[in-house]
């Protein structure tokens, strides 16, 4: 599981950029993460025009690979993750 301090930093960045909700999904939720795993983060409420600049900010400020998804744009994926229980709200 990814360290809490990293999750807090990710959440702080995303909330400051206007995200209303922040989610963790993937291997860090299912317990299959290893040292090479990326951190799968999804958001709701982010202005779509800010997506790439926010992703770049995460990339520059977090010393781990981030997979970043806008769940407002990918609602079917969000619903799927929710239905199988492989998502956790972190902010």
What are these regions (language model features)?
Residues 37-39:
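Periplasmic OmpA-like peptidoglycan-binding domain that tethers envelope proteins to the cell wall
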Residues 42-44:
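Short hydrophobic/aromatic beta-strand micro-patches
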Residues 1-23, 29-35, 46-91:
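Catalytic core of pol beta-like nucleotidyltransferases
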């Amino acid at each position: 599981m990814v360290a809490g301090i990293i999750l807090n930093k990710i959440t702080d960045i995303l909330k400051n950029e206007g995200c209303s909700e922040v989610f963790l999904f993937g291997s860090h939720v299912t317990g299959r993460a290893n040292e090479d795993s990326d951190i799968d983060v999804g958001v709701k409420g982010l202005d779509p025009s800010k997506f790439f600049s926010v992703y770049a900010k995460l990339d520059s400020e977090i010393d781990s690979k981030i997979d970043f998804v806008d769940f407002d744009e990918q609602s079917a994926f969000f619903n799927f993750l929710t239905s199988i229980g492989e998502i956790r709200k972190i902010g």
